[in-house]
Amino acid sequence: MKKYGYVDYDDTNVWVLTKDDYITTLNMFDQCYLRQVMSEFGQMEQTELVRYTYQHYPYYATKSHIAKSIMTKEEMDRIYKQQKKYDSSMLFTIGYEGLSLEAYINKLIINDIRLLCDVRKNAYSQKYGFSKAQLETACRGVDIKYIHVPQLGINSDQRQDLRSQKDYDILFDIYERTTLKENADALNYVRGLIDSEKRVALTCFEKDPKQCHRSRVAKALMAMPNKDYSFKAL
């Protein structure tokens, strides 16, 4: 926001809003909507705003660390009813392509995923929220564990010039014969995480699992003996 001039530092190193009158740059309809919001919520204190949100949208309080201290027992009962809890063990796969961080995290919450297993070789992304430290922090904030298993990733130079599904299939066939076999310990480690955490998601970038190696990791995990978990692609 500093980059675009919306906020700035004052001489005490505290973030402050700039003095520019941005409302005059809005069209008359947006100005009207903004004034309506200010009229309804402008005089509320922070706790009042949080309570209003939790009362009207209890789902957003399901991972809150402060809800119990500001909500009534009856309101907490409504919040508990929004929580998703499943007894079944399940392996998931999910790609973040085309998703905002909020939409992505909500998918994890709705499916009661308890551990996110990042199978990228390099857990770095130019997309906000999906580099390792950012994603781990976001998961921690909603009580989801995060772990990075780079041994199961594919080097970026191997992913060049993939123009058709056949190109992906050839690459992933090689991946199964080499990387997966050479990193059996890492694969068994993930299997152990599924056994202990019960609901685990493998994640990488691509939206289409057929164009991501996580599908082959999942295939190998589903082929393991004595498993008691099922599979779902998100």
Kindly give the residue locations of the regions a language model identified:
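Residues lining hydrophobic/aromatic ligand-binding pockets adjacent to catalytic sites
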Residues: 1-234
